[in-house]
Swiss-Prot record:
Subcellular location: Membrane
Alphabetized GO MF terms: phosphotransferase activity, for other substituted phosphate groups
Pathway recorded for this protein: Sphingolipid metabolism
Protein name (database record): Protein PHLOEM UNLOADING MODULATOR
Keywords: Lipid biosynthesis, Lipid metabolism, Membrane, Sphingolipid metabolism, Transferase, Transmembrane, Transmembrane helix
EC number: 2.7.8.-
GO cellular component: membrane; plasmodesma
Organism, as annotated: Arabidopsis thaliana
Length: 421
């Protein structure tokens, strides 16, 4: 896999997985073969992997990143339900989608492009689980020296960046509620949400929503002056110490037994807009692949990102602006988290280059003591690095086994839990 093998394996995975639509029989035959070959190759190389000490040092940041991402996803899930529930189902049924020039453009292309090309654009070639698996393949490729070790360091950067992105995304879409590009979405996914708006919306939004004169008065007085009438109350779930969430999630009597089960029930959101979570994952995978591996396969993954973006717009899962914002947010966030893991190789030569100017000035001034001190700093730094790598073989063996088992478990859970989007 060191010279193009990773790219071939990645493209083979995408092609074979797409065969489920073309030839389910061949898909069922080839996919187990591919996984078996990859698993055997990884297990074989793990026995000769030389960078377990680096992996051990990266384990704590990796675990911390997982905890951070889980917290971010929990906050996002709360916001996804709340942002739809606050206005009630009637608002979602009656409010038309926003005008989207990207959707118009794709419809126009359908009329002008050859039918075969349009079918390729419509095809479900790549999805969320594909991008996750492509990154997992990238992370495991450290055992083939295709990617700079530690793999857990690369994973920590990817997971932490995704957590930051999901947190920012939730804060963004909960700030201003946009109507879904699919008006039926709320009724299909949140059919037990009350039809009427929340009491906050009844007081601060409904009286002014369709009356320009009322909005002018609101701006002039800067106070909610309209009488909203009698509030229609909501069911209050008894969730113990978490009962305060009932105010935001607005559960019905039939679904109010557990707040956590309520969050898992929807299988996706409707008004979690402004930037796409699926596209964020796609862009982070492409950025990680480009920096860590590069080559022709990176260009292919960026093509997959573009295909995924146009399909998100075409199928009205998101507006065009959601995909565009996700692309540049993902790129910028990845650039900002290089302190966790970077493809740049820090060597003794790099350290020497950093103090080059100081050495030159000291040599010109004949300051032998300064020259000796700078050289000793390099030597001490190198010895510290070497000593930090000396860890008992037993510790490394236990850590290696635990890492492989834990990582494979995370892979299975990730693919299982994201199967519905």
């Amino acid at each position: 896999m060191t010279k193009g093998g990773l790219g071939i394996a990645a493209m083979s995975y995408v092609v074979i997985d797409y065969m489920r639509y073309v030839s389910p029989v061949w898909h069922s035959r080839l996919m187990p073969v591919l996984w078996s070959v990859l698993a055997i190759a990884v297990v074989t190389r793990v026995l000769f992997y030389k960078h377990w000490s680096k992996e051990l040092r990266a384990a704590i940041p990796f675990l911390g990143s997982i905890v951070f991402l889980l917290c971010a996803l929990l906050f996002e899930a709360l916001c996804v339900r709340s942002v739809t529930a606050v206005l009630g189902l009637d608002w979602h049924r009656e409010t038309p989608p926003l005008p989207d020039t990207g959707q118009w453009f794709l419809l126009a292309l359908n009329e002008s492009l050859p039918g075969t090309l349009v079918e390729i654009l419509r095809a479900h070639i790549i999805g969320l689980h594909h991008f996750l698996m492509l990154f997992i393949m990238l992370g495991f490729s450290v055992v083939f020296d295709s990617v700079k070790a530690p793999g857990l360091g690369l994973g920590a950067r990817y997971i932490f960046t995704m957590g930051v992105g999901r947190l920012l995304r939730a804060i963004t879409f909960v700030s201003t509620i946009l109507p879904s590009a699919r008006p039926w979405c709320a009724s299909a996914r949140f059919n037990n949400v009350p039809s009427q708006p929340h009491r906050w919306a009844q007081k601060y939004y409904v009286p002014y929503a369709n009356d320009p004169a009322a909005i002018r008065k609101l701006l002039h007085w800067d106070a909610a002056y309209a009488d909203p009438g009698s509030y229609i109350g909501d069911y209050r779930a008894d969730w113990g110490s978490m009962s305060f969430l009932s105010e935001f999630l607005r559960p019905s009597y039939s679904e109010g037994s557990s707040w956590f089960a309520l969050l898992k029930k929807a299988g996706g959101g409707c008004n979690d807009l402004m930037y796409s979570g699926h596209m964020l994952v796609a862009v982070l995978t492409a950025m990680a692949w480009t920096e860590a591996y590069g080559g022709f396969s990176s260009a292919m993954i960026w093509l997959f990102v573009a295909h995924s973006a146009q399909r998100e717009i075409r199928e009205r899962h998101h507006y065009t602006v959601d995909c565009i914002v996700a692309i540049y947010v993902g790129i910028l966030l990845w650039k900002m988290t290089g302190f966790i893991w970077s493809a740049e190789r820090k060597t003794k030569q790099t350290k020497l280059e950093k103090i080059q100017n100081s050495l030159i000035h000291a040599a010109k001034d004949g300051d032998i003591e300064t020259v000796r001190r700078l050289v000793e700093e390099i030597e001490v730094s190198s010895r510290v690095e070497k000593q930090s790598k000396v860890i008992s073989n037993r510790t490394m063996t236990v850590f290696a086994c635990a890492t492989v088992i834990t990582t494979l478990t995370i892979v299975i859970l990730a693919l299982t839990l994201t199967s519905d989007g």
